[in-house]
Amino acid sequence: MAVMSAGHAVADALARLGVRQVFGMAGSCMLEILDGMHGREDIYFLSVRHEQAAALMADAWGRITGRPGVCMATNGPGATNLVTGVANAWQAQSPVLVITGAPMMRDTFRDSAQEID
């Protein structure tokens, strides 16, 4: 059995679910997933300049296509910057999947950099 990284497994799962693009702003906690998407033709990452734009684009994608729009952000402020777009999607009942990072388990609940409880 071939060994697969968690990031490649996430990219494969998203592609199998019919996700063709992921909107987001690259951050260190997402590098494994971005690596899993790199070079693939069935799914790609569309980089934005602000996480709120990624959430709004995922919302628009969900409304237009009826298929889940996916947005990704790094932990801490990256995740909180998604809130307006995600709230907008929730209000409109559009299908949106949000993937965010988190601190390493050893740093959880220790007020580590960019931790949100």
Where are these regions (language model features)?
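N-terminal alpha/beta PP-like core and its mobile active-site loop of ThDP/TPP-dependent enzymes
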Residues: 1-117
